[in-house]
């Protein structure tokens, strides 16, 4: 729904309305919205604030549990519907039990088609800030199944704007399916071939739906309303969908991202370790490690390449600030950065973790991500 907004600032004594332009009106997702769309207003509805689908048993509790803390709970999942968390906990118990096949979890607690089409849309539009937030979870009464509902798409189709603003974000492992590797639900889905097949079908179908011809037809339809407000940039954005489709296909050829552990100092040595990466085709993996005094890794003090194991050791350097960068490589030569990144004024430096050495001891950077 389009809204043409005019504002009169009475605090300044103005008698006229200023034109604030054209806006789109977005419906708030709550019980009323569920009912308006033919869904169950009495069902469970959670706004995902920051949740990687880990069990988090110290926080995700039943509402009548004496240790239940609503504020802590809503740091992860904001309760927008029924406050009975029984089936949420049952789902998380199964999802985090790796002896339970993902195929049975998808058949009971999630709708494969829903997950596949949701992820396909995020991948094609480059809406990268959806790994663990910017979505809703909905489950109707008398059903164990949870559905992911799309929410907050303000980060989509941002590649051109980021280039103009010279901001480094939405790159490296945030492109393609590797963006979802840190989330238990999505990781287990992607490790399941039947889901990957459904995802590929959904991506191809949505890609056809987002064709340049269809988008241009829609633009022509809206032109009579929005013509005077159009800028050139949105008209040139279709290429980004095509680029995101290519990135999605290529992301299965690369290793998956992983986390770098906190460095350990002992007996005059500095030990580094990290999680193992994963390759969809089962190719052999190796790791390249660089330790430097700067986040661009130009002032290098230690480096190793083609490491077969996710660890290495070097002599303990003097006090100061240091950065470790780790990349995984498969047998085909495709590389992937670690999940860790270092923030600067121009955005993210991927695959890099900052730490300090003070009096021979490791001190973590408070801004480590």
Predicted regions mapped to residue ranges:
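An aromatic-rich alpha-helical recognition segment common to small helix-rich domains
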Residues: 274, 289, 324-326
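Extracellular fibronectin type III
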Residues: 331-365
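Middle-to-C-terminal accessory/interaction subdomains
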Residues: 77-132, 138-286, 351-354, 359-368
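Beta-strand-rich modules
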Residues: 316-335
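Solvent-exposed loop/turn segments flanking beta-strands in beta-repeat/beta-sandwich domains
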Residues: 277-297, 335
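Internal "kinase-insert"/substrate-recognition segments embedded within catalytic cores
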Residues: 7-120, 126
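Short beta-strand segments within Ig-like beta-sandwich modules, predominantly Fibronectin type-III
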Residues: 301-308
């Amino acid at each position: 729904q389009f809204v043409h907004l005019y504002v009169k600032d009475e605090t300044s004594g103005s008698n006229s309305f200023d034109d604030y332009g054209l806006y789109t009106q977005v419906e708030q997702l709550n019980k009323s919205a569920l009912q308006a769309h033919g869904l169950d207003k009495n069902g469970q509805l959670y706004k995902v604030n920051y949740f990687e689908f880990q069990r988090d048993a110290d926080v995700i509790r039943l509402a009548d549990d004496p240790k239940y803390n609503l504020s802590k709970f809503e740091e992860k999942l904001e309760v927008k519907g029924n406050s009975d968390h029984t089936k949420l906990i049952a789902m998380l118990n199964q999802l985090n039990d790796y002896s339970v096949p993902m195929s049975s979890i998808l058949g009971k607690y999630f709708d494969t088609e829903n997950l596949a089409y949701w992820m396909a849309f995020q991948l094609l539009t480059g809406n990268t800030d959806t790994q663990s937030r910017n979505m809703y979870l909905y489950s109707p009464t008398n059903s164990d199944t949870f559905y992911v509902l799309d929410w907050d798409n303000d980060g989509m189709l941002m590649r051109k704007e980021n280039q103009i603003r010279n901001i480094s974000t939405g790159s490296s492992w945030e492109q393609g399916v590797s963006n979802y590797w840190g989330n238990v639900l999505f990781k287990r889905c992607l490790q399941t071939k039947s889901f990957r097949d459904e995802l590929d079908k959904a991506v191809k179908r949505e890609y056809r739906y987002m064709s340049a011809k269809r988008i241009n037809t829609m633009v022509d339809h809206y032109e009579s309303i929005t013509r005077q407000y159009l800028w050139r940039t949105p008209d040139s954005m279709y290429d980004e969908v095509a680029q995101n489709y290519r990135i999605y296909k290529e992301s299965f050829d690369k290793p998956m991202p992983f986390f770098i552990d906190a460095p350990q100092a002992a007996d005059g040595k500095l030990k580094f370790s990290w999680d193992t990466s994963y390759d969809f085709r089962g190719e052999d993996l190796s790791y390249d490690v660089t330790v430097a005094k700067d986040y661009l890794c130009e002032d290098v003090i230690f480096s190793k390449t083609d490491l077969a194991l996710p660890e290495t050791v070097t002599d303990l350097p003097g006090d100061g600030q240091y950065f470790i960068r780790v990349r995984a490589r498969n047998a085909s030569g495709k590389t992937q950065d670690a999940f860790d990144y270092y923030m600067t004024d121009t955005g993210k430096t991927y695959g890099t973790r900052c730490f300090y050495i003070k009096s021979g001891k490791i001190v973590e950077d408070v801004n480590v991500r």
